[in-house]
Each structure stands twice: as C-alpha cells, then as structure tokens.
Amino acid sequence: MTSFAYTQKALELQQRFDTEALAAAELQLIVHDSLSPNDRAFIAAAEMFWLASVDPEGSPTVSFKGGAKGFVRMPDDTTLLFPCFDGNGMFFSMGNIASTSQVGLLFMDFVTPSRLRVQGDAHLTDDPAIVGLWPGAQFAVKVDITALITNCPRYIPRMQRLDGSRYVPDTTNGEQPIPGWKRIDAIQDVLPKRDQNKADTVGGLLTMDQWGEMVETGDPLA
C-alpha cells in the first residue's frame, strides 16, 4: 500500500467539485508503490522524462532529462537510477536533490500517447558500479519510489517521432558532440577547462544572436 495521500487543500477542492468519491477510488486503482510490468516496459522505452524538484525554501524547478532508450534503469521494483550527463553547469535540479531529496518524474510518450508519474526520495551517487552504467555520466541519481500514478492520455497531443538527440552520449564510449551554445564567444573564458578551445574544431565561434537564430530555425548543431 502506498503512503501517498491527498493534502487538505486537495480534499477541499475535491469536495467543491464533487470528486471526493472518484479521487478516493483512484487512490486504489491507479496509485501504487512498486513498478508493474507495464511500468517497467514504459520506462525502459523512454528517451526522456521531466524532473521536478524543490530547493530548501520550497521553490520548485523542473528540468528535462534525455538519453538513449533504456537510460533509466530499474534494479528492482521500487528503485530508479538515471545519469547526470554534461549540461549547462548550473545544477539546479541536482542541487535541489542534494538539499531536499523530494522529486517528481513525468514520463511521456507522445506517439501512443501515454504517461506515467513517479514520486520519490532521490540521492546523488558517485558509486562507480552505478555511474559506470552510462559512459559519459558525471554521476548518477538513485530514486526510492514512494508512489507511481498511472494517468490517462487525455489532453496529450499525438506526435510523430522523427529522431533522437545527436547529443546523447555514445552508449559504448560516452563521447558526444560539442553543443552549439559552447561555441558562443561571450562564454569562452568561463567554460570548464575540458571545453575550452574546442569551438574552432567544430566551425568556430558564434555570437549569442547567431546561436539564437540556429535554435529558432531548428538547426541540429544548435
């Protein structure tokens, strides 16, 4: 039985809109605390999810996480593992996890469509046996699942998948192309040492406006 429970304000809204009985039934029907076979198959096929976290003051943020199919691992029915790949260096979500641990994950399939929500307590790990599951990972995140919520596909726009991201690290050696924003002239002096002096190898420096135009036009090198 999951420990998931409605807040007082949620209960008040249920009463206002006559959904108390429905919401109580849904706790039994769609909320669970361990991965079902369907959950496992859905997550194993995912190339992305959205990660919600909160800082010590309770301010939330949400970030997009992507990888190759199967990049979210499930060592058992109550645990998720996922990598932290090279990003923008701000570590908003990872800093929140290190501070408060509470997370929400939203897995979406826009083709079918379908979705799955996961709530849990998360912790950062440098364990080589875990981090080594993803060549190119800086470290990893372990999520102890507290609730899974199966949602209907209502309101999800149906889309067609075209291609995966070219920036996902190679699953055998961890190599990945240099993203376009690391070519912006204004940030060259503050890039990590490992990324400095690489712009000339991939087409040279860009201004912020040039990079912005690449993003707006869907340039895959952005």
Located regions from the model:
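Binding-site signature for planar aromatic cofactors or substrates
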Residues: 1-222
